[in-house]
Design a protein with these regions (language model features):
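A conserved hydrophobic secondary-structure block that centers on an alpha-helix together
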Residues: 1-70, 157
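Solvent-exposed coil/turn segments that connect beta secondary-structure elements
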Residues: 14-16, 57-58, 152-153, 165-167, ...
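Soluble metallo-hydrolase cores and metallopeptidase-like ectodomains found primarily
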Residues: 1, 82-183, 199-206
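Short acidic, glycine/proline-enriched helix-loop-strand junctions
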Residues: 59-98
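Structural recognition of the beta-strand scaffold that forms the well-ordered cores
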Residues: 8-12, 50-55, 90-93, 146-147, ...
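Terminal peptide-recognition signature
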Residues: 4, 44, 94, 162, ...
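A generic structural signal for alpha->beta connector loops
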Residues: 49, 129, 209-211
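Acidic/histidine-rich catalytic neighborhood of metal-dependent amide-processing enzymes
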Residues: 29, 33-39, 43, 60, ...
Length: 220
């Protein structure tokens, strides 16, 4: 990409192999890390882009636009890598909006998506420009990771690790006075499962040969 510092890339979600049975091309219909939104933002920063906009499509993303909209209200980063691989602008664009954007520049979105599946595909430049103005607030917080440990009875050079994050989205807009986002089908289920595994394994008369580690990080 020429002059990437002046460009905002518009990219498709998922891998080029989406919908394919050919597991030799990426991993076929199974998403690889290269199809994830985080990788696309990271790669955009590595290329020196001004920004990256991912075209949302339900099947490719695995969730509807409402999930993107809800998760865009806040973002958490670890201090040690908060400045790594971030473009000044990272975001998503609705499929129909991207379709109109490309049409305004003389391109058909479906044709371009099909062409992009070829290893020989090269990015195209659009005449459109984008102006963005936003205001952010930053807050630094500390949140502990939790770890539990059952010593092994035999081969203590090896460990089995059970992992589940105990928090996910933290706090949000109060619902009936409760602002905690409990995540009952996400982190709460994993923690309940992990605690029960710890209780059962610790109650065994004959302890497992390997060390058992229960790790619960603060974020997903």
């Amino acid at each position: 990409i020429e002059n990437p510092q002046d460009k905002v890339a518009v990219v498709i979600v998922n891998d080029p192999g989406l919908g394919s049975d050919n597991t030799d091309y990426f991993n076929g219909d199974i998403m690889t890390y290269y199809g994830r939104w985080m990788y696309k933002f990271e790669e955009g920063a590595r290329q020196g882009l001004k920004g990256v906009l991912i075209i949302h499509e339900d099947r490719g993303a695995g969730y509807p636009w409402s999930v993107v909209r809800a998760s865009a209200q806040s973002k958490m980063d670890v201090d040690s890598d908060s400045d790594a691989y971030h473009c000044p602008l990272n975001g998503w664009i609705q499929f129909n909006a991207a379709k109109q954007l490309l049409a305004d520049n003389g391109y058909d979105i479906d044709q371009l998506i099909e062409q992009s599946k070829s290893p020989d595909f090269k990015p195209i430049s659009l005449k459109s420009t984008v102006t963005v103005s936003m205001r952010n607030t930053f807050d630094r917080q500390q949140s502990p990771n939790v770890i539990g440990y059952i010593p092994g009875s035999g081969n203590t050079d090896e460990s089995v690790i059970y992992l589940g994050h105990w928090d996910h989205l933290g706090y949000g807009a109060p619902i009936n006075g409760d602002s905690i986002i409990n995540g009952a089908t996400d982190n709460a289920v994993a923690i309940a499962w992990m605690l029960e595994m710890a209780r059962c394994l610790n109650a065994l008369k004959e302890k497992p040969r390997r060390n058992i580690v229960f790790l619960s990080p603060t974020c997903e």
